[in-house]
Amino acid sequence: MDHQPHNLGTTYPAIVGKVLTALRAQRNMPQKDLAQAVGVTQANWSRIESGHTSVTLEHLRRAAQALDMPPAQILAIADQTEVEASVQGVTIVDAKGVHDLHPGLILLAGAALGIFVTYAIMKSKS
């Protein structure tokens, strides 16, 4: 049995992707519609939302327009999510070489990361 300690972690692109997913879902916007507004395929946008690909500044600007909010607000929510995750002991690591540089790191994604995003969005509205 493996007794090596495991840490929970995530990447900033995964946080931004989850923020974009949550904001899109709040607006009941299908992923394909946001992808079209940004000018990428749904498959490419899915990789951005899942954190497998970093969003470019141009794509962030277009997504923000489609979501009717400034890009800075999206990044502010991502920054708040990063703070909340860090407070809870989640390590934020660089996406490049994440598994080589951080053996034993268990990356948060999906619902686990979504909890921090939801909290950050609620906090940004207060």
Label every PLM stretch briefly.
Residues 56-73:
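DNA major-groove recognition helix of helix-turn-helix/homeodomain DNA-binding modules
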Residues 22-47:
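Short alpha-helical DNA-recognition segment
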Residues 19, 30, 56-59:
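Residues that mark the N-terminal boundary/hinge immediately upstream of a DNA-recognition element
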Residues 50:
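Short, conserved catalytic or interaction motifs in soluble domains
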Residues 77-117, 121:
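Short, charged recognition helix plus adjacent turn
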Residues 1-26:
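A short, Lys/Arg-rich alpha-helix, primarily the initiator
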